[in-house]
């Protein structure tokens, strides 16, 4: 069975994208929650929503030597601190649909996905994550708010604030009665 992007429903809650893959004829319902860290352009996937047992398996794997070594290497390769490769969102009234253990997508694709016994679900999960990453590349939508200041403008700004300083250097603070610009 092939991954079919037409069977994806997408929604979003509090910076978490919820992907639901529903294939009624084959009785497959898969929910994947993904957080995108814009600073690092990194994706974190909620393994608790995929299967509740995966979070416990992951925590146990992480304590073993193979898990520690893999996490250390991934941390070194990505430049992300080891403690930042996972994130937990606690269950509360507001987070009912998105709570769980979020882990770096590399861990999902290369480690956790092999723990899923159903090969069809593995294939669909791989396709779903790759589809999301391919279709949601980071493009900054904030304008570039930088201004170039010439040397002449810098001199004018310094002159203006030098005048303000000259006028205010003898003033006292209204609360503690100390000279505002006292040099210490």
From Swiss-Prot:
It comes from the Viruses. It holds the Pfam family KilA-N. The keyword Zinc does not apply. PROSITE patterns: KILA_N. Residues 21-131 form the KilA-N domain. InterPro entries: KilA/APSES_HTH, KilA_N. Keywords: Early protein. Encodes a truncated version of the E3 ubiquitin ligase p28 protein present in variola virus. Lacks the C-terminal region containing the RING-type zinc-finger. The absence of RING-type zinc-finger in several attenuated vaccinia strains, demonstrates the importance of this domain in virulence. This is Truncated p28 protein. It comes from Vaccinia virus (strain Western Reserve) (VACV). The gene is p28.
